[in-house]
Amino acid sequence: MFSKPQNPLRSFILYFTGAPLFFLSSLFFIANTHGQTTFSEEVVFISKTGFLSDLKIQTTIFKPSGLGPFPLAIINHGTNLGNPHQQERFRPMAMVQYFIERDYVVIVPMRHGFAQSEGESTFSGKSVELYGLNAVGDLNATIDYAHTLSYVNKNITVMVGQSTGGWVTLAYGTSNPDPSVKGLVNFSGVVKEPCCFGLYNELIDVSGNFGDKTSLPTIWFYGDNDSLIDRHTANLMFVHYSHGNPNSRFIPFGLFSNDAHNLFMDPAGRKIWEPFLTQYLYDIGVPYKPTKKAI
């Protein structure tokens, strides 16, 4: 289908010349059956050009030990109910550790209006297509910033997202993606708001539009007992998407715990998605073998 086969130890504040960036840095140990390594965690605020003024985007960088350059994985967060600014900074550690073990730098931006990022994020029934596309500028700013870092490989990026972040990931693929982006990974991508009816039909239709506008390899993960999106809708979304972009793969992983929407964040979910994701990375020609040993 594709083209080829915890505990923080320290914290500090730094400033770069030019635009100031706030860093909160911590050092962690991880391990798996392959060995042991360390990785750092830093919180920075990067600039995104807005309509009237620049916005600061709260962003977390997880960096493996060493000088690099390392391939890049960007992970896009979902949306909690309530005020988006009250949402906590996203730390999807099962996925972070998966990529760290393979010597990726992992960057997790909080989109504008979420957590401590500036700006406002509202849906209020507007187009789900516009909702996804509205976040593309945040991702472009994230990649642009990442490519200023000496330890980032500017030729390899994997874009990952869960829930609304999965939908944003699909939207990004339609918007002249950076040449470094080699693939899109969608975990339970959906837009759902209590205020709005008929979103499922729109998601199905817009999925077709998204598929028509990209040829990037994609992989989709959806379960049978997801509280936010039923499998029938997910199936139809994928059918419409893959009609335009046959370079796509659907993983129906069945039931997971009491809510399949939690697969991405639950450490127990890793044993389900890991073999499929590893095969996908191999197929799209990016690093896929673990090189680290983690705890």
Q: Language-model features: where?
A:
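Alpha/beta-hydrolase
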Residues: N76, P109-R111, F187, F253
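The feature captures the conserved acid-bearing segment of alpha/beta-hydrolase catalytic domains
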Residues: G183, G189-G244
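Alpha/beta-hydrolase active-site loop
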Residues: S127-L149
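Primarily recognizes the serine-hydrolase "nucleophile elbow" in alpha/beta-hydrolase
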Residues: A141-I204
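C-terminal catalytic histidine-bearing segment of alpha/beta-hydrolase fold enzymes
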Residues: G244-I295
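Cap/lid segment of the alpha/beta-hydrolase catalytic domain
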Residues: L81-R91, Y98, V108-L133
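Short beta-strand element of the alpha/beta-hydrolase
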Residues: P69-G78
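N-terminal cap/lid segment of alpha/beta-hydrolase-fold proteins
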Residues: Q36-L67
